[in-house]
């Protein structure tokens, strides 16, 4: 079974620009991530256009609400035919468990359900401001364990956390990582980066990469080069 490891983060202001980009790459080489901005602008029909072109879609909306509402939201995502959808682990075990149970009826067609632990923008002071007396690393570990206990498929994490999380949570628990930059590319707004090969080597399962691919003159060539380093 084809299992592309690269997930291209689509960040376009215009739908046509996004679709023009997508036409330059192959679904056998990458999956696509649709976040809050593009989903708010272009809606479910945009996701259907992408899946209609043969792409697996990671719907990155980070649901966080009461359990019934989140369960209905992930059901709607499953009905859209997405490959992966996420929630905030800080919504708690009941919310995550109910969301996972809502996907039971989809069997093998259910999307992967993953959780976000601590946002990469949050530091020690931010957590303390929320009454959380843990370091970011401790809170990531706590929420990742809660995610697994709740039956979810994996977490979004930093590549720097991946090796420890994979050791603690097992090979089957998926790790999805942003902040990946091919060797030689600009860092953009990501301060701590790893190359695709480095990330895979420490246990990351799926690599979220944006501008180094979306801004490339030949994105398919860049994808092939990245894939060549991790296969």
Curated annotation (Swiss-Prot):
Keywords: Decarboxylase, Lyase, Pyrimidine biosynthesis. Substrate binds at residues 11, 33, 60-69, 120, 181, 190, 210-211. GO terms for biological process: 'de novo' pyrimidine nucleobase biosynthetic process; 'de novo' UMP biosynthetic process. Gene3D superfamilies: Aldolase class I. It catalyses: orotidine 5'-phosphate + H(+) = UMP + CO2. Its EC number is 4.1.1.23. GO terms for cellular component: cytosol. Pathway: Pyrimidine metabolism; UMP biosynthesis via de novo pathway; UMP from orotate: step 2/2. One of its GO terms (molecular function) is orotidine-5'-phosphate decarboxylase activity. SUPFAM superfamilies: Ribulose-phoshate binding barrel. It holds the Pfam family OMPdecase. InterPro entries: Aldolase_TIM, OMPdecase, OMPdecase_AS, OMPdecase_bac, OMPdeCOase_dom, RibuloseP-bd_barrel. The active site is at residue 62. The keyword Translocase does not apply. Belongs to the OMP decarboxylase family. Type 1 subfamily. Catalyzes the decarboxylation of orotidine 5'-monophosphate (OMP) to uridine 5'-monophosphate (UMP). HAMAP family: OMPdecase_type1_B. Homodimer. This is Orotidine 5'-phosphate decarboxylase. It comes from Colwellia psychrerythraea (strain 34H / ATCC BAA-681).
């Amino acid at each position: 079974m084809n299992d592309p490891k690269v997930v291209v983060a689509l960040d376009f202001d215009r739908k046509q620009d996004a679709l023009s980009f997508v036409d330059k790459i192959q679904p056998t080489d990458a999956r696509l991530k649709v976040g809050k901005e593009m989903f708010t602008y272009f809606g479910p029909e945009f996701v259907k256009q992408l899946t209609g072109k043969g792409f697996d879609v990671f719907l990155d909306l980070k649901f966080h609400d009461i359990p019934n509402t989140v369960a209905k939201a992930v059901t709607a995502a499953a009905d859209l035919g997405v490959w992966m959808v996420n929630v905030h682990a800080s919504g708690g075990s009941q919310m995550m468990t109910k969301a996972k149970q809502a996907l039971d009826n989809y069997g093998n067609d259910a999307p992967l359900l993953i959780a976000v632990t601590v946002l990469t923008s949050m530091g020690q002071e931010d957590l303390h401001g929320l009454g959380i007396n843990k370091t970011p690393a401790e809170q990531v570990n706590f929420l990742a364990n809660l995610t697994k206990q709740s039956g979810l498929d994996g977490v979004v994490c930093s590549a720097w956390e991946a090796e420890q999380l994979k050791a603690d949570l097992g090979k089957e628990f998926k790790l999805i990582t942003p902040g990946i930059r091919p060797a030689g590319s600009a860092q953009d707004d990501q301060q701590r980066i790893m190359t695709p090969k480095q990330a895979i080597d420490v246990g990351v399962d799926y690599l979220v990469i944006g501008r180094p691919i979306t801004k490339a003159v030949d994105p398919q060539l860049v994808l092939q080069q990245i894939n060549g380093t991790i296969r």
